[in-house]
UniProtKB/Swiss-Prot annotation:
Gene name for this UniProt entry: ulaE
Pfam family, one: AP_endonuc_2
Catalyses which reaction(s): L-ribulose 5-phosphate = L-xylulose 5-phosphate
Source species of the chain: Salmonella paratyphi B (strain ATCC BAA-1250 / SPB7)
Purpose: Catalyzes the isomerization of L-xylulose-5-phosphate to L-ribulose-5-phosphate. Is involved in the anaerobic L-ascorbate utilization.
Protein name: L-ribulose-5-phosphate 3-epimerase UlaE
Family under the similarity heading: Belongs to the L-ribulose-5-phosphate 3-epimerase family.
Keywords: Isomerase
Length: 284
């Protein structure tokens, strides 16, 4: 029987670096998490995962089966380097090929949701043409995802093009496809001039997962929990009252810390205490 508790996961980059997924999932289980989100970023090392052999893919599936800790989602931030909105046709083609490989990888290993980075371009200057190319690239990507039955979910970003649920919903309506949904980050959402609770309510019915982190205006990474502007309890209450029952993912970048597991455990306890106050989980 499926558990009725709220699934709580941890981002791969919060845990010690390395390519042994059995070790990573065992550690996540020890720390009390239900799942781990894989990162495929713009580095060559993580991009190489999309070219894993059949045996390497099966090893990940086996690690999930052995530990009971799932890998249901992928954070695909590689499109910073190879953006779908690039005016360089070769770069854009690489971006689409990365998308194709990511969808195939997800299909092979059981990943259900690929979180997309909402950048038309990242290292270049955006303009009307980059946005048009980005829209067309999303359409092509969602067509691929539909055939594979893999959900593409747009993150709410540290970038003006996609810094609110309202803006992401515009793309959802434009694409009008059940395999394109939203994956908001309550930290990014709170760092901009948004009515955060109204935005969360507006996204209900399209939100497939939620990133949990703290932020400050203009500071989107590595803000310790409790030191930023995010009203976690209100966000959790709003999501619960709106009927959201999906997963929450603690997003951290502690893989190079002296003791990543201790950092993660501290963050886990802090977040779960706010979840308990909001009635999402039972108090410890």
């Amino acid at each position: 029987m499926l558990s009725k508790q709220i699934p709580l996961g941890i981002y791969e980059k919060a845990l010690p670096a390395g390519e042994c997924w059995l070790e990573r999932l065992r550690l996540a289980k020890t720390l009390g998490f239900d799942f781990v989100e894989m990162s495929v970023d713009e580095t060559d090392a993580r991009l190489a995962r999309l070219d894993w052999s059949r045996e390497q893919r099966l090893a990940l599936v086996s690690a999930v089966a052995e530990t009971g800790v799932r890998v249901p989602s992928m954070c695909l931030s590689a499109h910073r380097r190879f953006p779908l909105g690039s005016e360089d046709d070769a770069v854009r083609a690489q971006g689409l090929e990365i998308m194709r490989k990511a969808i195939q990888f997800a299909q092979d290993v059981g990943i259900r949701v690929i979180q997309l980075a909402g950048y038309d371009v990242y290292y270049q200057q955006a303009n009307d043409e980059t946005r048009c190319r980005f829209r067309d690239g999303l359409k092509e990507s969602v067509d691929m995802a539909s055939r594979a039955q893999v959900t593409l979910a747009m993150e709410i970003m540290d970038y003006p093009l996609m810094n609110s649920i309202s803006k992401a919903l515009g793309y959802a309506h434009y694409l009008n496809n059940p395999w394109f949904q939203l994956y908001p980050d309550i930290g990014n959402l709170s760092a901009w001039d948004n009515d955060v609770q109204m935005e969360l309510q507006a996204g209900i019915g399209h939100i497939v997962a939620v990133h949990v982190k703290d932020t400050k205006p203009g500071v989107f990474k590595n803000v310790p929990f409790g030191e930023g502007v995010v009203d976690f309890e209100r966000c959790f209450e709003t999501l619960k009252q709106s009927g959201y029952c999906g997963p929450y993912l603690i997003e951290m970048w502690s893989e190079t810390a002296e003791n990543p597991a201790a950092e993660v455990a501290k963050a886990r306890d802090w977040v779960k205490a706010r979840m308990a106050s909001a009635g999402l989980v039972e108090a410890a």
